[in-house]
Amino acid sequence: MAGVMKLACMVLACMIVAGPITANALMSCGTVNGNLAGCIAYLTRGAPLTQGCCNGVTNLKNMASTTPDRQQACRCLQSAAKAVGPGLNTARAAGLPSACKVNIPYKISASTNCNTVR
């Protein structure tokens, strides 16, 4: 389990350093993952859901205000989930918006077609 946490932290650190967002650029995966960093323990170790995690989910929803940004956020979430691998609790990931009382227009799942997100 420690190996999964190290991998998850390394992936998040790399994505956070990925670079700033420019005015017309899509939301970066660093931004997406940075907002959800507080959710790692909840999603991988079954820790209790924290307000910090839910604040990140809310921030992410508010930042993804355009269709291209929502599609990019979807792709970033899928990439991060693949990087974490089998240590990710997919049911908790799918239920994260609901648990945080945040409505997002797509399901957090590896099977989500991000191109159809509006």
Swiss-Prot record:
CDD domains: nsLTP1 (cd01960). GO terms for biological process: cuticle development; phospholipid transfer to membrane; plant epidermal cell differentiation; regulation of cutin biosynthetic process; response to water deprivation. Disulfide bonds join 29-76, 39-53, 54-100, 74-114. GO terms for molecular function: lipid binding. SMART domains: AAI. PROSITE patterns: PLANT_LTP. Residues 1-25 form the signal peptide. The keyword Transmembrane does not apply. This is Non-specific lipid-transfer protein 2.
